[in-house]
């Protein structure tokens, strides 16, 4: 929800500022003097004396820029179509670095309060975004993120991702300048080992850029020096959090096939085999490293002779797990189906394999990371809109507990609860009482008052479900092992009543799943969405007819022309 609301605000603000600047230009022309227009513009904008004020003479900039062309484009807006914002002009003294640092820290301080799509982003985020519209400003923001985000804040890496993801794309010159400034190599990775925050933040920035610039730009960014730096950060002498984000950065670079080949040739799999043993480590930071190492070995950097984890994991006692067929695309699920992690910039969600319609049910979650996750209950009607920032608790068919921001979520609205912020190792309990139509949330055995809002929309068909912000991870217990804090009332567990075939328990690595999809033959007359049923339905009024009735009933607009669907007409009888 944070990312979506922020994007909407920026779009509307950009349009409004463009209109305002156009109006000022006409006023200046009418008055016949740039000075009068300048006075009017500056008097309307109140700023403090911190050096972040936007004292810009828009008309003077336009006059100077047109009169004195310059070859240096680093201080020019990147997008010539979008109207320039009121930012620092090309001849205004450079903002002091400590002011950029202050804006970054201010954003980190208020990020927990951004809970509503209708909520205006804080001034610090708006200002940082405006600064990043020039190459010089973008470089200042990136260097500040590396310099000042503290190691101990659980939302630090997520703030790096949030700010960079919403900033304008860097130019080729800006990327080149960044690599020159950082000057990364294996020796740099060994420096300042007693201050790991800088290396953690550097890896987080590189990973975010690799994800955002997948393709030729990502290939250019992965220089021999940067590859050497990231591989050196994976050595056992490094701090676990540095190892974690270096590995995540390498994963994101590997989204481009040429980079994947380059990284694989570096013998990275030999290092990951050692780190894989940390997957069940009692140290939750090492556990994250182990989880990501195992996932990379199974999905990206395959090692010859190594058996894939899903082929050797013991699932005999597991009868309910996270559903790998009911999950948004970037969520990582462990081979035993009980642990999930998100390293993408989107808000990833998943449901359990077992659905309940009556009775009293309970499950627990162990918090591995203490950042933003929304965990609770959802029906099949609850939508996963990961790129828009909507997850569990963001519609009328789900309700979620958020232990980081200390909120209960329902229908995209939140209310505070009295539990303290969760931390690594905490146990969150989720009780669903369909007899009394209530949900009860527990933190380490301490319960909150019952929640009943969701039952105004639905009374059955509930799944355990969760949504994850960037770099978050937790483990689910559906009853395959004893609960840490079982409630006092009588309840049932998923594992006692669910059933999965051996085939349904398998969570295939992505390359195996893709190989199977390539073997699937698709009939010419099949539905273009599900590729399973016959395309037997025509949409009115547009007339498109390449869908089955089941898929057509789930749509409000035509997926081809985006026209609203008024009616659906079945053209032929269903043929199996």
Swiss-Prot record:
**UniProt name for this protein:** RING finger and SPRY domain-containing protein 1
Biased-composition ranges, Polar residues, are 57-68
The root-end lineage is: Eukaryota, Metazoa, Chordata, Craniata, Vertebrata
- Where is this chain glycosylated? 314
The gene coding this protein: RSPRY1
Q: Bias category Basic residues: which stretches?
A: 83-97
Which GO cellular component terms are attached? cytoplasm; extracellular region
Gene Ontology process terms (BP): proteolysis involved in protein catabolic process
Domain (B30.2/SPRY) ranges:
300-483
């Amino acid at each position: 929800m944070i990312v979506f609301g922020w994007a909407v605000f920026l779009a509307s603000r950009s349009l409004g500022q463009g209109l305002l600047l156009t109006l000022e230009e006409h006023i200046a022309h009418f008055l016949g003097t740039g000075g009068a227009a300048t006075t009017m513009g500056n008097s309307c904008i109140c700023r403090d004396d911190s050096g972040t004020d936007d004292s810009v003479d828009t008309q003077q900039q336009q006059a100077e820029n047109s009169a004195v062309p310059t070859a240096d484009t680093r201080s020019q807006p990147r997008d010539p179509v979008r109207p320039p914002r009121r930012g620092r002009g090309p001849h205004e003294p450079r903002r002091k670095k400590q002011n950029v640092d202050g804006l970054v820290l201010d954003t980190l301080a208020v990020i927990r309060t951004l809970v509503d799509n209708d909520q205006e982003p804080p001034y610090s985020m708006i200002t940082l975004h405006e600064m990043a519209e020039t190459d010089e400003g973008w470089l200042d923001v990136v260097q500040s993120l590396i310099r000042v985000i503290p190691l101990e804040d659980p939302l630090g890496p997520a703030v790096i991702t949030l700010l960079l993801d919403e900033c304008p794309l860097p130019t080729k010159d800006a990327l080149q300048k960044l690599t020159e400034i950082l000057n990364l190599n294996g020796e740099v990775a060994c420096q300042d080992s007693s201050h790991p925050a800088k290396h953690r933040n550097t890896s987080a920035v590189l990973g975010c850029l690799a994800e955002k610039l997948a393709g030729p730009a990502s290939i250019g960014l992965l220089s021999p020096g940067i590859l050497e730096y990231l591989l050196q950060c994976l050595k056992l002498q490094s701090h676990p959090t540095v190892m974690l984000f270096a590995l995540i950065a390498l994963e994101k670079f590997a989204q481009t096939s040429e980079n994947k080949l380059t990284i694989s040739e570096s013998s990275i799999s030999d290092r990951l085999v050692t780190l894989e043993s940390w997957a069940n480590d009692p140290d939750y930071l090492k556990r994250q490293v182990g989880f990501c190492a195992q996932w990379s070995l199974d999905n990206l950097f395959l090692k010859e002779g190594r058996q894939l984890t899903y082929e050797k994991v013991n699932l005999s006692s597991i009868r309910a797990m996270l559903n790998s067929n009911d999950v948004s695309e970037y969520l990582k699920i462990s081979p035993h189906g009980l642990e999930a992690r998100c390293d993408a910039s989107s808000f990833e969600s998943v449901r359990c394999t077992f659905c309940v319609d009556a009775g009293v049910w309970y499950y627990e979650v162990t918090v591995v990371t203490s950042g933003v996750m929304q965990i609770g209950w959802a029906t099949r009607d609850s939508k996963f809109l990961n790129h828009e920032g909507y997850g569990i608790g963001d519609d009328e068919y789900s309700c979620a507990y958020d232990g980081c921001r200390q909120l209960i979520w329902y229908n995209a609205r939140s209310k505070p609860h009295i539990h303290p912020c969760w931390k690594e190792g905490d146990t969150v309990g989720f009780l669903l009482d369909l007899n009394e139509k209530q949900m009860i949330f527990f933190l380490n055995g301490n319960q909150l008052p019952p929640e009943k809002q969701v039952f105004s929309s639905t009374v059955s068909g509930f799944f355990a479900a969760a949504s994850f912000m960037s770099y978050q991870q937790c483990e689910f217990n559906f009853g395959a092992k004893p609960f840490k804090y079982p409630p006092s009332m009588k309840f049932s567990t998923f594992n006692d009543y669910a059933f999965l075939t051996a085939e349904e328990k398998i969570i295939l690595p992505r390359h195996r799943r893709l190989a199977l999809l390539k073997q699937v033959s698709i009939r010419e007359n099949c539905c273009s969405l599900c590729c399973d049923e016959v395309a037997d339905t025509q949409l009115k009024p547009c007339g498109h007819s390449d869908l089955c009735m089941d898929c057509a009933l789930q749509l409000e607009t035509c997926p081809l022309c985006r026209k609203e669907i008024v009616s659906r007409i079945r053209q032929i009888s269903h043929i199996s």
